[in-house]
């Protein structure tokens, strides 16, 4: 980056839960997709981790927004402000004036034309000059290290915060895909509802997220790897008195059952639409899991048992899409599947 390099290249995984930015092959920003705005002036107060700390704790003059819902932009203005704020965090100090941005952004494979347009417009408003889009399962496959241009079939299941993307990839294209709006956020919401219904305790989105991370599981039998019970503090729903409730992984596994079944059904439906030759490749290679949802205890085992095809968790599931987007950024001229 010299004083006169006029183009800065950044790759962005614009996620419902987290936004990750890569520049020069390194992750430079990895922050929650949250922005805090002043209600009176609509000016940005905080973005990322700082805004997340304010989430669910604000007074009437501040609103915290998660601009993406179900993997797509729900609040256009907030999304643009958030992208601007996060791009600012990327080191641009050593320029005399702000460079023009070349960007590659990951988008859900089930996006409509309107949704793709919204991402592109947001990026352009946030300073992007040259904006390319890549479908997330394709980016995840590249990030995992799969040769996506090879004439063989690979299946990716990317479980993010807002959507689960399932795609069969061959010869640099998506052969069959299925994108459902059941993902990490729904698991968190299932836990919130369960705690309220079963234990009469009110828990915040963040507390439900902690429960999911500490004792979340896809199976009710974990054997020796079972996590210890997690103690939840919160107000009684009826009396508002403080409560202390221990939660075990078995009950969490039960309450996540419905959402996980939806993901299983979506995977089976994508396999049904896969041509037989590619299906044979997938059985041979196994199916790759990426995204934060891949970290749910024993999810890979449950899916392997249910579908009879081995499931492999990506090496760094949280950053697979971002890494793949970073590789795409270096190969903008070569990868014909990038959308302009």
Located regions from the model:
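Nucleotide/phosphate-binding catalytic cleft detector across ATP-hydrolyzing
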Residues: 1-159, 167-287, 294-340
């Amino acid at each position: 980056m010299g004083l006169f390099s006029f183009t800065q290249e950044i790759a962005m995984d614009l996620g419902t839960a987290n936004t990750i930015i890569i520049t020069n092959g390194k992750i430079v920003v990895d922050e929650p997709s949250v922005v805090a705005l002043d209600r009176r002036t609509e000016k940005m107060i905080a973005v990322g981790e700082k805004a997340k700390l304010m989430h669910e704790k604000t007074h009437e003059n501040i609103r915290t927004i998660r601009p993406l819902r179900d993997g797509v932009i729900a609040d256009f203005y907030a999304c643009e402000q958030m992208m601007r704020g996060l791009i600012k965090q990327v080191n641009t100090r050593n320029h005399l004036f702000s460079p023009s941005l070349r960007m590659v952004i990951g988008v859900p494979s089930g996006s409509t034309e309107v949704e793709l347009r919204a991402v592109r417009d947001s990026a352009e408003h946030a300073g992007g000059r040259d904006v390319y889009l890549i479908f997330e399962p394709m980016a995840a496959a590249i990030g995992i290290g799969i040769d996506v241009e090879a004439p063989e079939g690979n299946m990716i299941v990317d479980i993010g915060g807002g959507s689960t993307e399932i795609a069969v990839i061959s010869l640099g294209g998506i052969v069959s895909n299925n994108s459902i709006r059941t993902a990490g956020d729904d698991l968190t919401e299932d836990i919130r509802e369960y705690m309220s219904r079963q234990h009469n305790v009110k828990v915040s989105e963040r507390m439900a997220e902690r429960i999911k991370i500490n004792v979340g599981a896809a199976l009710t039998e974990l054997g020796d790897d079972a996590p210890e019970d997690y103690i939840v503090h919160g107000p009684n729903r009826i009396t508002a008195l403080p409560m202390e409730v221990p939660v075990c992984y078995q009950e969490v596994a039960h309450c996540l059952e419905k959402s996980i079944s939806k993901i299983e059904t979506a995977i089976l439906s994508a396999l049904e639409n896969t041509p037989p030759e590619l299906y044979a490749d997938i059985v041979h290679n196994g199916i790759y899991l990426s995204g934060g949802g891949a970290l749910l205890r024993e999810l890979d085992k449950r899916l392997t048992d249910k579908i009879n095809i081995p499931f492999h968790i990506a090496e760094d599931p949280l950053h697979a899409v971002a890494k793949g987007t970073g590789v795409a950024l270096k190969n903008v001229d070569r990868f014909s599947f990038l959308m302009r």
